[in-house]
Regions:
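Membrane-embedded alpha-helical bundles that constitute the cytochrome b-like, heme-associated redox core
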Residues: 1-228
C-alpha cells in the first residue's frame, strides 16, 4: 500500500476506532438520562452532564472526520503537478478548509447564541463548499433518484448538519423542553444515519481499488461488467 492508500483508509479507521464507540456511549447515556428524568430511575446524577459533554465531543469529532475525508479525496485525486486549477485553486481550497476548522473551534468556544448560530452555519457552508468539488465522488446529486438516498456523501452531510445543530443549540437544549424534544428527534434520525453510513461506507470501500490497481480496474467496462 502507498501513502495515498493509507490516507484513504484514515477516515473509515477513525470512524471505527473513535466515532462509533463514542456514539455507543452517548446513546447509552442519553437513555439513562431520559430514564432518570421521565421514569425516575435512580441513575447517578452525572449521567446528564456526561451525555452532554460526550455529545459535544461526538459532534465536533464527526465534523472533523468529514473534513479529513473531503481533504483526502481532493488532495489525492491527482498528483500535485496535475491538480486541476493549479496553485491558485489549491490555495483557495486550503483557505476554505482552514476557515471551516477555525469556525468549528469558534463554535466550540462561543457563548452567545447568535455567534453559535453564525459559526455553525459557516462550518456547514465550508463542508458543502469542499464537498461540491469535482474530486469528491457522489453517488448522485439528484434528490429524485434512488441513488441520492443511498449516497454516503449526502448522508454524511445530513448527519454533519444534525451534529452542528446539537453543538450550536446545546445550552438552549438544556433549558427548553421544546428544543429538548427536537434534539431527541434529531438524535434518533442521526442514529439511523450513522447506521446507514456504516453500511454505505463499507460498500464504497469495496469499490475503491488500491493505487496500483486503478489503471487495470478503470479500464473495465462497468456497464457490461467486463475487463480487457
Amino acid at each position: 500500500m502507498t501513502v495515498t492508500d493509507w490516507l484513504w483508509i484514515l477516515h473509515p479507521a477513525l470512524a471505527v476506532v473513535l466515532i462509533y464507540p463514542l456514539i455507543g456511549m452517548v446513546v447509552r447515556l442519553a437513555w439513562q438520562t431520559r430514564q432518570r428524568r421521565v421514569a425516575q430511575v435512580k441513575h447517578p446524577p452525572v449521567v446528564g452532564r456526561d451525555h452532554s459533554d460526550l455529545g459535544r465531543w461526538l459532534a465536533a469529532g464527526v465534523v472533523l472526520l468529514v473534513l479529513i475525508a473531503l481533504t483526502v479525496a481532493i488532495a489525492t485525486k491527482a498528483p500535485p503537478a496535475d491538480f486541476s486549477g493549479g496553485v491558485g485553486r489549491a490555495t483557495q481550497l486550503s483557505i476554505v478548509l482552514l476557515g471551516t476548522g477555525a469556525s468549528l473551534v469558534a463554535l466550540w468556544r462561543s457563548k452567545a447564541a447568535a455567534l453559535r448560530l453564525s459559526f455553525s452555519l459557516i462550518t456547514l457552508i465550508g463542508v458543502l463548499t469542499l464537498g461540491a468539488q469535482p474530486e469528491v465522488w457522489r453517488l448522485s446529486d439528484d434528490p429524485l433518484s434512488s441513488a441520492f438516498w443511498q449516497s454516503h456523501y449526502w448522508a454524511g452531510v445530513a448527519v454533519t448538519g444534525l451534529m452542528l445543530f446539537s453543538l450550536a443549540a446545546r445550552p438552549e437544549i438544556l433549558r427548553d423542553l421544546r428544543l429538548r424534544r427536537l434534539h431527541v428527534t434529531a438524535s434518533v434520525l442521526a442514529a439511523l444515519l450513522f447506521v446507514m453510513q456504516g453500511i454505505t461506507g463499507t460498500r464504497d470501500l469495496l469499490e475503491i481499488p488500491l493505487s496500483w490497481q486503478k489503471p487495470a480496474v478503470y479500464a473495465c467496462d462497468f456497464d457490461l461488467q467486463r475487463c480487457p
